[in-house]
Design a protein with these regions (language model features):
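A preference for well-ordered globular domain cores
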Residues: 1-184
Length: 184
């Protein structure tokens, strides 16, 4: 069986062999894939159309998973690196790793003044060096509320991007999919 202009699918052939229930081998010749199919358990040999459809289905699923992982990584990076607040009077950048979030929540619960790591952001948007700066308990509470709102906004935005991705049902539509940028 020859699959014309199908060389882009070669990485997904092993999965097709498994899912359609056959053994065999393949060779890429130019843009074509030449398949040698051996059915398992006396089953019927799949048609070229069945093989191509299954290839597209598997490739679509794999590419959607890759894009979803990219969306998750973008969201996580923005949560960790892009949070800004003016609770200290002027704009400061704060990290929001899980540890930072836990520490912030612990300070809110303790209801105490404390130092918290942040960096001043100048008028050009350049972030200085992070240092531990004094925060009142009111500033810590406000910072926590702003951080939660920021994180929630990102999660909702990128969750909607994953919903857009999930609705895609063809490779053609997937090729046109571009992850939108969250603008603060």
């Amino acid at each position: 069986m020859i699959l014309e202009n199908a060389c882009d699918y070669k990485g997904y052939l092993a999965s097709v062999f498994d899912e359609l229930g056959f053994y065999g081998s393949f060779e890429v010749v130019g843009d074509n894939i030449e398949l040698n199919i051996i059915p398992k358990d006396n089953s019927e040999t799949p048609t070229k159309e069945q093989v191509l459809e299954k290839l597209k289905e598997i490739m679509l699923k794999a590419k959607k998973q890759e894009l979803e992982a990219q969306i998750n990584a973008i969201c996580k990076e923005k949560i960790v690196k892009d949070f800004r607040s003016s609770v200290l009077g002027n704009l400061h950048a704060y990290d929001l790793t899980l540890e930072d979030q836990a520490n912030l929540q612990a300070l809110v619960i303790a209801n105490i003044d404390s130092v918290f790591r942040c960096a001043e952001v100048n008028n050009d948007g350049v972030v200085g060096n992070k240092t531990y700066k004094n925060h009142t308990k009111a500033q810590i509470l406000k910072l926590s509320q702003e951080a939660l709102k920021f994180k929630q906004s990102l999660i909702i935005f990128y969750g909607r991007e994953k919903e857009r991705l999930s609705a895609i049902t063809s490779l053609e539509a997937l090729e046109k999919f571009v992850i939108k940028e969250y603008l603060i």
